């Protein structure tokens, strides 16, 4: 529905690469050009995103490290330790590919 509004969005950021790729597919079906008419980004940097055109701009997340941190907390909890809610920052990286254009280029 959002893509059918007037004026439509100039960019969409989805919470996963799969959802971002589905937006690109839908945009193409509607006659929109990515990134000329609509910029699209995702999260995860999964391997297959470069198999589609345009190649998806995404945020690479340190999934392995996220699993390590989570497992350490889980093991502490299983060991009977009272674990308080914590916030852990893990570095991430913007991977710029072909699915976005600068606003002044649109």
Question: Language-model segments: what does each one mean?
Answer:
Residues 1-106:
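Flexible loop/turn connectors
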């Amino acid at each position: 529905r959002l893509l059918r509004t007037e004026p439509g969005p100039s960019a969409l950021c989805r919470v996963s690469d799969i959802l971002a790729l589905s937006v690109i597919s839908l945009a193409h079906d509607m006659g929109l050009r990515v990134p000329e008419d609509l910029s699209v980004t995702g999260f995860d940097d999964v391997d297959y995103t470069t198999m589609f055109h345009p190649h998806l701009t995404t945020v690479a997340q340190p999934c392995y490290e996220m699993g390590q941190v989570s497992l350490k907390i889980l093991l502490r909890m299983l060991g009977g330790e009272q674990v308080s809610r914590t916030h852990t920052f893990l570095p991430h990286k913007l991977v710029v590919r072909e699915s976005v254009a600068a606003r002044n280029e649109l």
